[in-house]
């Protein structure tokens, strides 16, 4: 058989797979007689409303000299780590707004950062394809810098996202532009498992984000530029447990729902979607029409501790607060008083759900306190 014939057969097989996938998608839509918001409205549910005192800026964290790209809270809720274009990680006391650590990075092109469950170390990664670990309790060197305590090397592309395994300081999962996710043993610096890559059932484009289930740390979900999200079990690296096909653009961000049975995705197609990992079904689409025809991309997201609210950052600088039950925007954080002067770039909620932190291209971070909505956050 000639190369041309092989290519033709491959193209025909690919088209058949795509046709079957579309038929499956349409069949699922037929079987789902309603979505979450439709059912909620039928039960008489009303959307959350926000007044001027329901989400208030209570702290401004100033110290970076470049755009803030990423942030993360400690589980004990009183410290934040942020990564910036200025090539530094800064650890903040969220109660006093003071810096406790300022770490100069070996590579300034950082894209992601994470706090360990104990709060004793932080991790970051970026265009150097390495995930660097810093022990916050280690002594500084003669130049006043914190030395790298461990460099996790093995990716062949940029490190786009990292997250510690819950309740473990010794294991961490990264996603990369090399189309893989990796589970690392931080103690040895070695890869425990590689998800994707040479395996047939992995992503076929850059992996942009990972999120680990808090209720079952063996499960994590990844989002990729191949327009899919995939559910993985850390005990089975050879294939994804389930693949979710619903977006029409790159999946830039994924986040588990608080109960661990669902997760959300955010995409270049301008939508966020909620999926059930048990059935594989899409439960809801969150989309805000824009009259100018230019659809802003979803770049980051976070659920409130109850799951009732979804905070979503868009490429045009908007930061919408969605009522997940009724699929309705209840607030644009970028338009409220005392919001950032630049576009909001990243966001995250404290472990107890009582505070929201946003990072911005204006080099600052802001902490927002909830007023009258503690019952739904």
Swiss-Prot record:
User: Which SUPFAM superfamilies does the record match to this protein?
Assistant: WD40 repeat-like
Q: Could you say which residues form the signal peptide?
A: none
Disulfide bond residue pairs: none
Cite the entry's keywords alphabetically: Cell membrane, Endoplasmic reticulum, Membrane, Repeat, Transducer, WD repeat
Q: Does the keyword Protease apply?
A: no
One Pfam family linked to the record: WD40_Gbeta
Q: What induces it?
A: By auxin.
Q: Where are the WD repeats?
A: 63-93, 105-135, 154-185, 202-233, 246-276, 293-323, 339-369
One cellular component GO annotation, for this chain's record?
plasma membrane
Biological process terms from the Gene Ontology for this record are: signal transduction
User: Which CDD domains does the UniProt record give?
Assistant: WD40 (cd00200)
- Subunit description: G proteins are composed of 3 units, alpha, beta and gamma.
| Function statement | Guanine nucleotide-binding proteins (G proteins) are involved as a modulator or transducer in various transmembrane signaling systems. The beta and gamma chains are required for the GTPase activity, for replacement of GDP by GTP, and for G protein-effector interaction.
Q: What is this protein called?
A: Guanine nucleotide-binding protein subunit beta
> Which species does this protein come from?
Nicotiana plumbaginifolia (Leadwort-leaved tobacco)
* Taxonomic lineage from the root: Eukaryota, Viridiplantae, Streptophyta, Embryophyta, Tracheophyta
């Amino acid at each position: 058989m000639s190369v041309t014939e092989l290519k033709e057969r491959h193209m025909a097989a690919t088209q058949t797979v795509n046709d079957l996938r579309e038929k499956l998608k349409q069949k699922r839509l037929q079987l789902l007689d309603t979505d979450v918001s439709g059912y909620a409205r039928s039960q008489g549910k009303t959307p959350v409303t926000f007044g001027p005192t329901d989400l208030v800026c209570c702290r401004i964290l100033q110290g970076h000299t470049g755009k803030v790209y990423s942030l993360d809270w400690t589980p004990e809720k009183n410290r934040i780590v942020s990564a910036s274009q200025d090539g530094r990680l800064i650890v903040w006391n969220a109660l006093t707004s003071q810096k406790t650590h300022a770490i100069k990075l070996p590579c300034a092109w950082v894209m992601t950062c994470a706090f360990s469950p104990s709060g004793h170390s932080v991790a970051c990664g970026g265009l150097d394809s390495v995930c660097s670990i810093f022990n916050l309790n280690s002594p500084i060197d003669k130049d006043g810098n914190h030395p790298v305590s461990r460099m996790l090397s093995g990716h062949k592309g940029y490190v786009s996202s990292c997250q510690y395994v819950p309740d473990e300081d010794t294991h961490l999962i990264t996603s990369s532009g090399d189309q893989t996710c990796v589970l690392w043993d931080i103690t040895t610096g070695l890869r425990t498992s590689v998800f994707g890559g040479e395996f047939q059932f992995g992503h076929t484009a850059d992996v942009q984000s990972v999120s680990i289930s808090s209720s079952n740390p063996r499960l994590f979900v990844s989002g990729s530029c191949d327009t899919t999200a995939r559910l993985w079990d850390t005990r089975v690296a050879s294939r994804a447990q389930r693949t979710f096909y619903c977006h029409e653009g790159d999946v830039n961000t994924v986040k588990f729902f608080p109960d661990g049975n669902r997760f959300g995705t955010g995409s270049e197609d301008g939508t966020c979607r909620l999926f059930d990992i048990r059935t594989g079904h899409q439960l809801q689409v969150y989309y805000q029409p824009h009259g100018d025809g230019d659809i802003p991309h979803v770049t980051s997201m976070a659920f409130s501790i109850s799951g009732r609210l979804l905070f979503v950052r868009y490429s045009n600088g908007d930061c919408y607060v969605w009522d997940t039950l009724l699929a309705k925007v209840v607030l644009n954080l970028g338009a409220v008083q005392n919001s950032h002067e630049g576009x909001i770039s990243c966001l995250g909620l404290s472990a107890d759900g009582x505070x929201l932190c946003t990072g911005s291209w204006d080099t600052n971070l802001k902490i927002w306190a909830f007023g009258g909505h503690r019952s739904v956050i």
